[in-house]
Curated annotation (Swiss-Prot):
It comes from Rhodopseudomonas palustris (strain BisB5). Its cofactor is FMN. Keywords: Flavoprotein, FMN, NAD, NADP, Nucleotide-binding, Oxidoreductase. It catalyses: a quinone + NADH + H(+) = a quinol + NAD(+); a quinone + NADPH + H(+) = a quinol + NADP(+). Gene3D superfamilies: 3.40.50.360. This is NAD(P)H dehydrogenase (quinone). InterPro entries: Flavodoxin/NO_synth, Flavoprotein-like_sf, Flavoprotein_WrbA-like, FMN_Rdtase-like_dom, NQO. Binds 1 FMN per monomer. NAD(+) binds at residue 12. One of its GO terms (cellular component) is membrane.
Amino acid sequence: MAKVLVLYYSAYGHIEAMANAVAEGAREAGATVDIKRVPELVPPDVAKASHYKLDQAAPVATIGDLADYDAIVVGTGTRFGRMASQMANFLDQAGGLWAKGALHGKVGGAFTSTATQHGGQETTLFSIITNLLHFGMVVVGLNYGFAGQMKLDEVTGGAPYGATTITGGDGSRQPSANELAGARYQGKTIAETAIKLHG
């Protein structure tokens, strides 16, 4: 049975919700799924004063965990059109795994959130995907088999490169039903690909 890791960073809970949806989709495909988050780099007093969501249930990942999975789906909010520094810092520690080729052939995917429709969703996904390709991973996006990609009757995230959500400038908008459906679809597709490749 394929093992899938949903690895995320979420300051305010939007990506945490998307990570749970990705995991639901992967489980639906028959994979064993773990959800883990990367360490917070913001000092605790600053995080609390900034109203970060500090009660997230997922355990904190270690870089060595990555080698234990057949698929790794990476999610993080955007910071100026690229992945958040917390995720970048974590992935930057994978040099030893990269040098050994420990991630070659694993399935990868990316998901993100931005404050606005044009807040850097695709560039943030690319910043994650670039890392996955350097690791030698097989990248799976959010294909157009997901009909929600074509919705024009509502503001919604989603790109062929990965599932996305729009949070609003003040963070008050939570992932919509369509955005969560996209995350589930991508999780299922990634797990199905991992099962085909790794059994």
